[in-house]
Each structure stands twice: as C-alpha cells, then as structure tokens.
UniProtKB/Swiss-Prot annotation:
Protein's UniProt keywords contain Glycosyltransferase: no
The keyword Ribonucleoprotein belongs to this UniProt entry's keyword annotation: yes
Biological-process GO terms, alphabetical: response to cadmium ion; response to zinc ion; ribosome biogenesis
Record family assignment: Belongs to the universal ribosomal protein uL10 family.
Annotated stretches, region: Disordered: 289-320
Protein name: Large ribosomal subunit protein uL10y
Native species: Arabidopsis thaliana (Mouse-ear cress)
GO CC term (a single one): ribonucleoprotein complex
Lineage top rank: taxon: Eukaryota
Name of the encoding gene: RPP0B
Residues carrying Phosphoserine: 305
Keywords, alphabetical: Phosphoprotein, Ribonucleoprotein, Ribosomal protein
C-alpha cells in the first residue's frame, strides 16, 4: 500500500475538519498536555456516539478553519483561531456540553513527578511513617524535611510543601516522591474554551445553575437600568422609571407655577386646603366601619324583643 504524501495528508485533514465543522455547531477546545495515546483512545471510546475528538498541529487546524470560512462564508468559525494555542485538540459534539465536559474529566489518570516537569498544582507531603529504613534519610535532609526514626523506619514530622505550582520538578523531589510511591499529578484533556454557534465562552459557564443565571440576568438588568437613568438614555427597562420621574418633574413645575394639567389639579387643591386630606381619610374609615353597624343594630334589637316576650310569660303566671 502506497503511503500518502504530506500534501495528501494535509488535504485529507482539511476535508475532515471542514466536514466536522459543517456537521457540529458545538466545539470544546481542550488542552492535551501529558496525555498519552492509550488515554486518548479511552476518551474517544467514552465519547463515542455523539462526539468526535480531533487532534492535530495548531497550524493545520488554523489553516483548515480559514479554508472552511473562505469556502462557506462562515466568519463566526474564525472565533476559534485565537483559542488554538499550545497543545490543544477539538471535541465536536451534539450532546449536552456540561455532560460531555464531565465525561472528559473522568479519564484523568495519576502521573509521577518527572524531572523538569512544570507542576500543575502544589505538592504537599503529609506527616506520617514512610516505611523507609534509616539509610534513606539523606533524601529528606537534602530537601530540609524534618524526620525522626520510629520503630526502625523514617517518619515525617510535619507537612512539607515539596513543590509549588508552576515550579519545575527537581531530581531530588522526583526521587523522593518515587520512593514514597506518590503520584501527585493527574493528567487528561482539560476543557479550556467552549464554542457554541459562533459564541465563545469559558467552561465555568457550564457549571452555572438556572437560579444563578436568573440572578446574574436580574443583576445585569438592574445595572443597565441605573446607567440608563443616570445618562438619560431610554431603554426598555429604564423607560417606566423615566416616565415616572418626568411626571414628578411636571407635577412639581405645575405646583410651583400657574401651569396646570388635569392630574395636577387635585394635588393643587389638596395643597391649598390640607384639611381635605383629613376629611378624605375619615370618610374612608367611616365607609369601612359602617358595614358592620346595621348588623350590630339588628342583633341588639332582637335581644330586646326576646326580653319582652320572656317578661310577658311571667305576667301570665302571676295572674293565675
């Protein structure tokens, strides 16, 4: 079988990536540092059905994206270009983005601290018995780790931050962690960005609940409304408040001048004679309380009638 030339491989890659862009509208951009071929194969199997994992050189991916944009006029896909930095791959999916992201995270595997590797996290060695014999104390002394001999083995006395995040792993740290059987790092595909129908956002957005989204949306509307009111710029959210403020201003002008309009007449009338406020409130209270008065009168009248009838009965007995 004749091997494909480099040019033919590029054309095949362009064709495949363009087909995937046509078929899928959701793409996860994932970092693939320290991910082995076996691990990547397991991820592909786990996502099989509604997702496709595509790896490749950044230059090839960028070239294919530009070709697709030129051929189809899809300029939104160009938003992917700034995201193709470093050792990254693309996961094309038709599934729920959060579920796919969670599935990818399941395939992280533990890894030893190799010399020269940049630590993705802080590495802290906890106190306790190491199981190492006293002849191994030199490893601890080089790293200034306080120890003691307990029952013929080396015991670490206090927690020690062996490697800080971002630092390179040294030979002494790597050797000690290997002797302790500690695999401090875990590697897998890490979602860096999410592309969805032309929009690009952080993967943290996938963790937001519906209540959090509503809260953020309400907060945004409140901020926009406040800004619109401050600069007197009409928006749908600010319009009701602007109308109310305008009405208050017009009312204040009408009260202070001879200018008037129907809604201002009643206000002016009350301001000229404040006692009308009291009359109106008393009338309202009387109207509320008056409903129970007839019923009370009827009850009282009925009680008086009963007493009269009862007294008449005694009169009949007296005559006999």
């Amino acid at each position: 079988m004749v091997k494909a030339t480099k040019a033919e491989k590029k054309i095949a890659y362009d064709t495949k990536l363009c087909q995937l862009i046509d078929e899928y509208t959701q793409i996860l951009v994932v970092a693939a540092d320290n991910v082995g071929s076996t691990q990547l194969q397991n991820i592909r199997k786990g996502l099989r059905g509604d997702s496709v994992v595509l790896m490749g050189k950044n230059t090839m991916m960028k070239r294919s994206v530009r070709i697709h944009s030129e051929n189809t006029g899809n300029t939104a896909i160009l938003n992917l270009l700034p995201l193709l930095q470093g050792n990254v791959g693309l996961i094309f999916t038709k599934g729920d983005l959060k579920e796919v992201s969670e599935e990818v995270a399941k395939y992280k595997v533990g890894a030893p601290a190799r010399v020269g590797l940049v630590a993705p996290i802080d590495v802290v060695v906890q106190p306790g018995n190491t199981g190492l014999d006293p002849s191994q104390t030199s490893f601890f002394q080089v790293l200034n780790i306080p120890t003691k001999i307990n029952k013929g083995t080396v015991e670490i006395i206090t927690p020690v931050e062996l490697i800080k995040q971002g630092d390179k792993v040294g030979s002494s740290e790597a050797a000690l962690l290997a002797k302790l059987g500690i695999r401090p790092f875990s590697y897998g595909l890490v979602v860096q960005s999410v592309y969805d129908n032309g929009s690009v956002f952080s993967p943290e957005v996938l963790d937001l609940t519906e209540d959090q989204l509503v809260e953020k949306f309400a907060s945004g509307i409140s901020m926009v409304t406040s800004l619109a009111l401050a600069v007197s710029y009409p928006t749908l959210a600010a319009a009701p408040h602007m109308f109310i403020n305008a009405y208050k201003n017009a009312l204040a002008i009408a009260v202070a001048t001879e200018y008037t309009f129907p809604q201002a007449e009643k206000v002016k009338e009350y301001l000229k004679d404040p006692s009308k406020f009291a009359v109106a409130s008393v009338a309202a209270v009387s109207a509320d309380a008056g409903g129970g008065a007839p019923a009370a009168a009827k009850v009282e009248e009925k009680e008086e009638s009963d007493e009269e009838d009862y007294g008449g009965d005694f009169g009949l007995f007296d005559e006999e």
